[in-house]
A protein has these predicted regions:
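Histidine/acidic-residue-rich catalytic or RNA/ligand-binding cores of hydrolases
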Residues: 216-221, 246-266, 284-289
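Short acidic/histidine-rich active-site segments
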Residues: 235-241
Length: 289
């Protein structure tokens, strides 16, 4: 079992720093890792002290930071200071012993047609992923690449497009890196989809946020071993609540504790159960360390 946790982005000047941890952002400002290096290092030291070996960290999210766009809306490459921030993150991961699961993009990337076009063409892979892998592909501080977080929350994007993009990214990562590849599946019921050979994944990932008000919204992981899913690859519970008492308004979590998830993972043959989130970036709170 892999002891892991969702970082998933820093807190900068008291605010969640979603999409702005790496490089210049669309507001022509910089709030990346190197802008608060000591705080990030302290976070990793705390995770290491708590026994975590991998942390899941979002990189380009919805395209607001870390990448450059031409005046016409075409993806042109990584943003200024991106490599400064990622160099620092990789060094901190290496020195702390907490490796990185880097989430390349979030499902919100798919909300804009120009951003989708960058995935449907070779732009993202050739102009963003390739330079990234050329610099970090051989670095063992990176445990894995999560190509896209929860794409099943954007079913409007054709599944053939999703398979083609993730498959191409996976091929490029495997060509240039020893790191593993996954997709952050947003629903338990989607697990079988990620096992399709088109994605080229090394392990399958599902996220579990059961809601007592809507028991039919998704399947449950409880009462099931990883083998019960009938997958050809290992299965990770990549996100789960830290505390059943901490949840957003309008969401009613069952009484499963983080200890229950970890016991399920241990006894059920899962790769692990990674709580959301170390930085308490939303109402689901943070686990006790």
């Amino acid at each position: 079992m892999i002891p892991g946790i969702n970082y998933p982005w820093t807190i900068f000047q008291g605010r969640p720093n979603y999409g702005c941890d790496f490089g210049w952002n669309k507001w022509n400002s910089h709030a990346g890792v190197t802008a608060h290096l000591d705080e990030v290092r302290a976070d990793f030291e705390s995770m290491a002290s708590a026994g975590y070996e991998v942390t899941r960290w979002f990189v380009f999210t919805d395209g607001r930071g870390g990448v450059d766009w031409s005046p016409g809306g075409e993806l042109s490459g990584v943003a200024d200071r991106f490599f400064d921030d990622m160099d620092a993150a990789v060094e901190i991961a290496r020195s702390s012993g907490v490796r990185l699961c880097l989430v390349l993009i979030d499902f919100a990337w798919l909300d804009d047609p120009l951003r989708r076009a960058a995935l449907e063409s070779a732009a993202f892979i050739d102009r963003v992923l390739d330079p990234f892998l050329d610099r970090y592909g051989g670095d063992d501080a990176i445990h894995s690449y999560d190509v896209i977080n929860e794409p099943d929350w954007r079913p409007q994007w054709p599944i053939d497009n999703l398979r083609a993009f993730v498959g191409a990214a996976s091929n490029r990562i495997h060509l240039k890196s020893r790191a593993l590849v996954t997709v952050g599946g947003g629903r338990v019921r989607s697990a079988k989809e990620w096992d399709d050979a088109a994605y080229g994944l090394d392990f399958i990932q599902v996220h579990s946020y059961p809601d007592l008000r809507y028991p039919d919204r998704d399947e449950t992981v409880f009462g099931r071993t990883a083998a019960d899913f009938g997958l050809s690859k290992p299965l990770l519970i990549g996100e789960c609540p830290s505390d059943p008492r901490a949840h957003p308004d309008g969401h009613l979590s069952p009484a499963y504790t983080l200890a229950d998830y970890l016991n399920l993972a241990r006894e059920g043959g899962y790769l692990g159960a990674w709580p959301w989130s170390f930085k308490a970036v939303d109402a689901f709170g943070a686990p006790a360390l």
